[in-house]
Amino acid sequence: YDWTKSAGQQYFMQQAKKYGVDHFLLFSNSAPVQFTKNGKACANKGVSGSNLADNHYADFAKFLTTTTKHFTDKGYNITLIDPVNEPQYDWTEGQEGSPWTNECIAKLARELDKSITDQGLSAQILLPEACQWKALYQDGTEKRANNQIEAFFNTSNSSTYIGDLKNLKRAIAGHSYWTFGTNADLKDIRQNVWNKAQEYNLDVYQTEWSMLDKEPSTSAGFPSSYDAASYMDISLYMGKLIHCDLTYGNMASWSYWTSFAQEKWGQKNRFYLLRMNTQGDNNNESYGDIQNGGTITDNSNLWVLGNYSRFIRPGYKRIDHITNKEENLN
């Protein structure tokens, strides 16, 4: 191992710890290329199962736990290991990632569980980072890795059941993409995933969202198009989505993707909390090389998220409240 690699990521870990962050999650989009079927960190078209070679599941698990132990020994409190991401997708031709069937995820989880125990770690496994909520509770939503709560936690599914693993977090992780276009989706889909999670006593974690989809409907209170929407319209809708994730989905964790980025192609602030601009930019959009320096500017999205994270602290509990007033998400 060369522990000087990923210096930028390590810098942010150091700064986060300095500012008081006391829980860290380590995630992987792909196994190291020496363990993959095609020697790449993305998959070939038509790959079966996953891009992780069949004889390297234990090796990948050991890589994850060795890395976790290294940072634990350096004083970081690594609470979660997140080994797969959006397993429903193909992840071909250049974008880092791997498809995973439920069977392959279960196989990796079992190896990772053993390796965590062997290394004497306290970190737990978080799964499965579903690309959208429906893949967690129903069949036929995506081309693979569907109905994942049942697959992993129903004992009758012998090939994929992992609910008895000692080091598996009693939570289910997914993403709020593709399910925020209408008020009905914001409510019903989130209630569905919560209801299914409750059958197996699982927390629900929302671990990745930005405004990746066509614009929400005007009936949901959004302008007629992204072109017509202001930066504040986008931020306020993000606040509405967080509210629905917390209240209808009872989600115990919420994360945004990504912290900072360059604004491009008329997308405004759909994909960042902080905007990066390179030297010489004349407006908000930026297409230059950030390695040449520039500026970082906060955005209203940061304050939307901050007004949740500042006032809803770890360990807080929601109190049930029933009202006879008609619900109005707008």
Pin down the residues of each PLM region.
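Surface-exposed intrinsically disordered loops and tails
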Residues: 1, 33, 39-52, 139-163, ...
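N-terminal catalytic cores of secreted or lumenal carbohydrate-active enzymes
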Residues: 1-79, 93-106, 110, 114
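Conserved beta-strand positions
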Residues: 26, 83-86, 127-128, 174, ...
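Short glycine-enriched loops at secondary-structure junctions
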Residues: 27-33, 84, 210, 260
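Short acidic/His/Gly/Ser-rich catalytic and metal-binding motifs that mark active-site loops
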Residues: 32-44, 88-93, 134-137, 213-218, ...
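Noncatalytic carbohydrate-binding groove/subsite architecture in carbohydrate-active enzymes
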Residues: 57, 69, 74, 96-241, ...
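Aromatic/acidic polysaccharide-binding cleft in carbohydrate-active enzymes
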Residues: 206-310, 319-325
